[in-house]
Amino acid sequence: MATKKERALEVIEEKTALLWPMSDTLWDHPETGFHERYAAELYGKTLEQEGFQVERELAGIPTAFSGTYGQGGPVIGFLGEFDALPGLSQAAGADEKRPVEENGPGHGCGHNLLGVGSLAAAIALKHYLQDSGLPGTVKFFGCPAEEN
């Protein structure tokens, strides 16, 4: 029987086919703060596919959302950033400046990776709660405009 840590890593490995392309897609569709509609929709759909209840437009912000799985305590939250910065457009894999769109936005701080990494942790914890039968709530908070 796998340890808790091994099981979490197994879940993340099982989700690699979902998570890596998601990160690459976010890289290819950079959106600046409060304009991350593509990213918010992608995260929302992915959370729903993974069994989370999604609440959109939190606090009246069109690109803010949360995903919730489970019930009761403890409540464990993960923050997912997904905004890009203006003027940092860059072709994937290029080791010199090569903008996709001159002066366009880009993920200079790696939010395409950070947000998806947080999502991976939330999904792994969800599976742990499912497998163990333990109570608890997993929350994923989609954080728009973190750079603003």
Residue ranges and their predicted role:
Residues 143-145:
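Short loop/turn motifs enriched for small/polar and acidic residues
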Residues 3-107, 116-136, 147:
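Acidic/His- and Gly-rich active-site-bordering loop/insert found
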